[in-house]
């Protein structure tokens, strides 16, 4: 996809903004859901229905207090079908998906089957063959699945990619990635601690970094897993233009001495690469592009899914 101007600048008097679109949201109580709610409102659209089995969703009041809310999928489905029969003014045009990882593809199928596009959090799916099934459904329905790969829209990452693309062929870089985000005992009991539901550490906390690195430095030529444990993974990647050492963990004991909370470090050829600022509106940018039909496609997201699945299955 190309780089786009902010949504408000892509329309003018001769090409006015289209009428607001209706959004449904699945996973309204999740930690990332407020970013989606904000993006829906910031792009001039309406959240009209939301779903989550947990009812701690007071955040909805900040964005769409009149949105219908459901704790059961069947009732949400019934409501969406009712809206569909009420005509284009009322139907869901998009469904935002923030549910647990292992439910993403099912909820994407729901969106497409009711005539809506899906905007799905990462990872889209846990296994590459599930992407093939979604591709077939896109072709059958004419609807699209747009993926949240917001790091590709970060100004610092875009500038890095432009720099790497302009270099002479054959030049290689050394990349060191460490990301440690401590999680308590609850993590092991929740769906996030079950690799069959979350995809494990590689999918759950690493996939957006893997996607970014492959977008900037090219395809995977070889990968090695040095540690593969329920709470931590470590390995090396040989990409087209870089050799990458990566270390991912949710174990508090892995935090370097002197640091508290989450620890993230990305070093390029020994120098720190800072992209800690500028995250605030990236989900809104993802929505802007999806609304213009130029979002991140199934083809864009597939390489990182293939990599994460292979890392999960590898023996250290």
Where do the language-model regions lie?
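Short hydrophobic segments within beta-strands
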Residues: 26-27, 51, 98, 148, ...
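Beta-loop-alpha module in the N-terminal Rossmann-like domain of NAD(P)-dependent dehydrogenases
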Residues: 69-119, 123-135
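N-terminal Rossmann-like dinucleotide-binding module
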Residues: 2-68
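C-terminal active-site/capping subdomain that shapes the small-molecule cofactor and substrate pocket
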Residues: 248-316
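C-terminal helix-rich "cap/oligomerization" subdomain common to oxidoreductases
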Residues: 3-19, 82-86, 94-96, 288-316
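A contiguous active-site-proximal alpha/beta segment in oxidoreductase catalytic domains
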Residues: 102, 125-185
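Rossmann-like dinucleotide-binding domain that binds NAD(P)(H)
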Residues: 185-254, 299-306
């Amino acid at each position: 996809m190309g780089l786009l101007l902010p949504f408000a600048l892509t329309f003018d008097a001769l090409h006015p903004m289209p009428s607001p679109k209706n959004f449904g949201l699945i996973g309204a109580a999740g930690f990332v859901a407020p970013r989606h709610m904000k993006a829906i409102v910031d792009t001039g659209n309406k959240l009209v229905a939301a779903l989550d089995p947990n009812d701690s969703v007071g955040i909805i009041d900040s964005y769409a207090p009149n949105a219908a809310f459901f704790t059961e999928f069947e009732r949400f489905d019934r409501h969406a079908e009712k809206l569909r029969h009420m005509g284009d003014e009322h139907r869901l045009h998009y469904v935002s998906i923030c549910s647990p990882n292992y439910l993403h593809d099912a909820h994407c199928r729901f969106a497409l089957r009711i005539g809506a596009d899906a905007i799905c959090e990462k990872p889209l799916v846990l296994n590459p063959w599930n992407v093939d099934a979604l591709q077939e459904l896109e072709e059958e329905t004419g609807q699209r699945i747009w993926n949240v790969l917001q790091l590709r829209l970060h100004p610092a990452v875009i500038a890095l990619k432009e720099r790497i693309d302009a270099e002479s062929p054959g030049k290689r870089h050394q990349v060191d990635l460490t990301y440690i985000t401590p999680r308590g005992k609850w993590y092991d009991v929740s769906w996030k601690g079950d690799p069959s539901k979350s995809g494990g550490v590689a999918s759950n906390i690493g996939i957006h970094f893997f996607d970014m690195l492959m977008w900037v430095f090219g395809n995977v030529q070889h990968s090695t897993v040095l540690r593969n444990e329920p709470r931590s993974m470590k390995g090396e990647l040989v990409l087209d233009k870089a050799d990458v050492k990566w270390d991912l963990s949710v174990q508090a004991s892995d935090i370097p001495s002197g640091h508290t909370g989450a620890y993230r470090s990305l070093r390029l050829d020994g120098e720190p690469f800072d992209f800690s600022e500028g995250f605030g509106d990236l989900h809104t940018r993802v929505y802007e592009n999806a609304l213009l039909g130029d979002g991140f496609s199934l083809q864009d997201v597939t390489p990182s899914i293939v990599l994460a699945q292979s890392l999960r299955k590898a023996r250290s």
